[in-house]
Swiss-Prot record:
Keyword Cytoplasm: yes
UniProt keywords, alphabetically: Acetylation, Cell projection, Cytoplasm, Methylation, Nucleus, Phosphoprotein, Repeat, WD repeat
Name the record gives this protein: Dystrophia myotonica WD repeat-containing protein
Alphabetical list of SMART domains matching this protein: WD40
Modified residues (Phosphoserine): S495
Polar residues biased stretches: 642-674
Upper taxonomic lineage: Eukaryota, Metazoa, Chordata, Craniata, Vertebrata
Positions carrying N-acetylalanine: A2
Annotated gene: DMWD
Function: Regulator of the deubiquitinating USP12/DMWD/WDR48 complex. Functions as a cofactor that promotes USP12 enzymatic activity.
A GO CC annotation given for this chain: perikaryon
SUPFAM superfamilies documented for this protein: WD40 repeat-like
Length: 674
């Protein structure tokens, strides 16, 4: 489907009047995604609330040790929260975290609990920040679109003074009705650990700002860990914490543990267990976001220097590197099977990078401003032969999927999510992106883009042809048959040697295995060889010399031979030199994707994108949360009215204005003042 191929026929290139209209539904091959009629009032009040003047606030103390105090009184509950950007310092981006606690609330459509004790009941819990405030709500149940997030009835509310919450994350591994662990990062550098059930459980890390004085840009619990988490800062540092250990009373001392191209890893010098346990210095400038692979073994980081770096977390080795086309990278996510990484950033593009091949496989152009959020949709990402091969769960055969293409691909329509791929076949990855241009885009990454058959089949003679099997299938997998979960030892046997360099990898930088030399040069040879296979002789001659840039001390002539053979603490990637190599291919050297859907869905920049089984959740900077029902999951007007009444949950997907929160002081107890 062409860009913007939804109802109304408008797209990115339509008239200004059409582009200004906020969409309430969009269509894909599986049907219509709808924002139901119950959201009309909230939608009409959205722009008005964004223009409501914010009452003058009392002066706040500057962030620092003096403002990091214990529990205290909250600010006035009657003043509306800030809506949208305004004069003065920019507000932190609105973030949303969701945790699932097993079975949904037994109350069904009954009134949700209005006290903090209600956090212990089943269902989902949602946390999001707005300005200096942090809100907690009962979220969507497992039938995601059949319950809305009622922003007028918060379970808990916390107001912070002197600093602002910038990010947060629930511990899904330990989440239960008796404990909900949450991490909150702040603009002054502190990190708070709290339990929403056990009110006496609360800790503040980096309280005196001795570890790092810059804002916390992102934090995440380690997969399947009860106590370990990572926190990244605007300084470009990534810290490993243990909630069971205290912080040192003096600035921590570190010893160099490992070093490579563009990164360094330090261990804390301390006889007693103290936080932080380790520090990573990654890239140049702020470390904007990071994400663990589905198997929890690899860590993908994106920085303001425009680099995507993928590390093997346990061995702290650099496994992959990619450079943005322009500017910094702001967001990152993994595909459900761990084969691909998608990034978005200041080049207005979404970039798909293959972890198994170490190269950019596609770029997507549909946004007109920075891309703030990217996410794969595991419920429409599918392998069409998986159902036939597995023969489980009563899924339809491949012939039935071909007969009913519009019904395939949704979580409720018999699609086969990739987690991981049981068998190689016709693969379609679905992912989405949300940008500062208020546009929401959906993208399909299909097999013809991932494995282009005709050009490669004519000249490629080495094993591991991408046109026949996925790249991981031809890699040495230590005896593991077929493409399954990414193993700890991922071989690069499908990498092609450079015709001039003989495939030698000199220079430190990227390592495939401990003790095995691996350099960025192999990334460059991949793209150069594929350009030759496509018959692009002109491009090959034009950029042939650039293939030696990243080969370090491999003996090649040109600027590559001038790089030092030893590791460097920070990245020295020159954008002018890497452009045209595998680290950063030119626009015409990789497929350019068109969005399946590209719609304006908000008045302010979008900051949140979550894919759930029955719905999609988006949020924008003015504090509006939208729930989009998947095809076949939306109620009619009569059903919505029948299930929405006085004192009951509105059971249709809705978008609510945070301005209504302040009218519920009884439901908004204050928390820790930082």
């Amino acid at each position: 489907m062409a860009a913007g191929g939804a109802e109304g026929g408008s797209g990115p290139g339509a008239a200004m009047g059409d582009c200004a209209e906020i969409k309430s539904q969009f269509r894909t091959r599986e049907g219509f995604y709808k924002l139901l009629p119950g959201d009309g009032a909230a939608r009409r009040s959205g722009p008005a609330s964004a223009q409501t003047p914010v009452p003058p606030q009392p002066p706040q103390p500057p962030p620092g040790p003096a403002s990091a105090s214990g529990p205290g009184a909250a600010g006035p509950a009657s003043s509306p929260p800030p809506a949208g950007p305004g004069p003065g310092p920019a507000l932190p981006a609105v973030r949303l975290s969701l945790v699932r606690l097993g079975e949904p609330d037994s109350a069904g459509a009954g009134e949700p609990p209005a006290t903090p004790a209600g956090l212990g009941s089943g269902g989902d819990r949602v946390c999001f920040n707005l300005g200096r405030e942090l809100y907690f709500y009962p979220g969507c149940c497992r039938r995601g679109s059949q319950r809305s997030i009622d922003l007028n009835k918060p379970i808990d509310k916390r107001i912070y003074k002197g600093t602002q919450p910038t990010c947060h994350d629930f511990n899904q591994f330990t989440a239960a009705t008796e404990t909900i662990s949450l991490l909150v990062g702040f603009s002054a550098g502190q990190v708070q650990y709290l339990d929403l059930i056990k009110k006496d459980t609360s800790k503040l890390f980096n309280e005196e700002r001795l570890i790092d004085k810059t804002k916390v840009t992102y934090l995440k619990w380690l997969p399947e860990s009860e106590s370990l988490f990572l926190a990244s800062h605007a300084s470009g540092h990534l810290y490993l914490y243990n909630v069971s250990h205290p912080c040192a009373s003096a600035p921590p001392q570190y010893s160099l543990l490992k070093q490579g191209e563009g990164f360094s890893v330090y261990a804390a010098k301390s006889k007693a267990p103290r936080n932080p346990l380790a520090k990573w210095a990654v890239g140049e400038g702020p470390l904007n976001e990071f994400a663990f692979s589905p198997d929890g073994r690899h860590l993908a980081c994106v920085s303001q220097d425009g680099c995507l770096r993928v590390f093997h977390f346990d061995s702290m080795l650099l496994r992959g590197l990619m450079k943005s086309y322009f500017g910094g990278l702001l967001c990152v996510c993994w595909s459900p099977d761990g084969r691909y990484v998608v990034t978005g950033g200041e080049d207005d593009l979404v970039t798909v990078w293959s972890f198994t091949e170490g190269r950019v496989v596609a770029r997507g152009h549909g946004h007109k401003s920075w891309v703030n959020a990217v996410a794969f949709d595991p419920y429409t990402t599918r392998a069409e032969e998986a159902a036939t091969a597995a023969g489980a769960d009563g899924e339809r055969s491949g012939e039935e999927e071909e007969e009913e293409p519009e019904a395939a691909g949704t979580g409720s329509a018999g699609g086969a999510p990739l987690s991981p791929l049981p068998k190689a076949g016709s693969i379609t990855y679905r992912f989405g992106s949300a940008g500062q241009d208020t546009q929401f885009c959906l993208w399909d990454l299909t097999e013809d883009v991932l494995y282009p058959h005709p050009p490669l089949a004519r000249t490629r003679t080495l094993p591991g042809t991408p046109g026949t099997t996925p790249p991981a299938a031809s890699s040495s997998r230590g005896g593991e048959p077929g493409p399954g979960p990414l193993p700890r030892s991922l071989s690069r046997s499908n990498s092609l040697p450079h015709p001039a360099g003989g495939g030698k990898a000199g220079g430190p930088g990227v390592a495939a295995e401990p003790g095995t030399p691996f350099s960025i040069g192999r990334f460059a040879t991949l793209t150069l060889q594929e350009r030759r296979d496509r018959g692009a002789e002109k491009e090959h001659k034009r950029y042939h010399s650039l293939g030696n840039i990243s080969r370090g001390g491999s003996g090649g002539s040109g600027s590559g031979g001038e790089k030092p053979s030893g590791p460097v603490p920070r990245s020295r990637l020159d954008p002018a030199k890497v452009l045209g190599t595998a680290l950063c291919p030119r626009i015409h050297e990789v497929p350019l994707l068109e969005p399946l859907v590209c719609k304006k869905i908000a008045q302010e920049r979008l900051t949140v994108l979550l894919f759930l089984e029955d719905c999609i959740i988006t949020a924008c900077q003015e504090g509006l949360i939208c729930t989009w029902a998947r095809p076949g999951k939306a109620f009619t007007d009569e059903e919505t009215e029948a299930q929405t009444g006085e004192g009951s949950w509105p059971r249709s997907p809705s978008k609510s204005v945070v301005e209504g929160i302040s009218s519920q002081p009884g439901n908004s107890p204050s928390g820790t003042v930082v």
